[in-house]
């Protein structure tokens, strides 16, 4: 377990970067977040959690939820059913690209871009009677926090600005790769993105990625092989179009969200969550990436 002093050092080390990024402003509910927040939490495979800075302040997890939705799909479907509808390759395009969906005849490159996550949400919608409730149940169980909830204001705000995601879904539907009612699936998808969690919640919830598929309670969520495969996808595609830069600087599987959160994993050791709302040009937390880079260097850890 890293010492508290190290986590505090990491937070202070990146504080001078505040003001250099830009808070997501495409929906009003995200634009109003205090840009000066910085938080970090780590959870070890022994189940201990430690944090520094604003690590107990909840934020909108946004695309980090795509890890949970894929994990849930892996518990409900044969893998062949999932991977026949979504790929495993980095995209090289923006996370909400229509061009790639058109060029590749409705099959998204990976489950962590919007098109891929919409296919996963479509799969969940068709298999579950109450997909929103099931997701909430899962993240509460994984984080050991039954107060985790959806931010309805964020979900509604995203729905009101959903034209592009609807276009992606309808385009995939035209190629036969979207089964459900687009509006219903979009509402589910936006609720997933609108989960509100803090760094401590997320570092606990993602522990299964560091612990061979076992959650913080020791329950097996997915198999050891599936966990390794999921971490591989996170290493290649988890950071939008900045995955290569992140691998170079941080050297861990990770997933970011435009709410400013990033989760990262040192397999066999610990799961980490950082939060700083200001984003870089790729939509990844600017100071968050720097916190993970500094922590990785100080711990001497990298998967490479």
Curated annotation (Swiss-Prot):
Keywords from the UniProt entry: Hydrolase
Catalytic reactions of this protein: L-glutamine + H2O = L-glutamate + NH4(+)
The EC number(s) this enzyme carries: 3.5.1.2
Protein name stated in the entry: Glutaminase
Domain of life: Bacteria
One BP annotation, GO: glutamate biosynthetic process
Binding locations of substrate: 63, 114, 158, 165, 189, 240, 258
Residue ranges crossing the lipid bilayer per the database entry: none
Organism lineage: Bacteria, Pseudomonadati, Pseudomonadota, Gammaproteobacteria, Alteromonadales
Gene Ontology molecular functions: glutaminase activity
Presence of the UniProt keyword Hydrolase in the record: yes
Assembly, per entry: Homotetramer.
Family to which this protein belongs: Belongs to the glutaminase family.
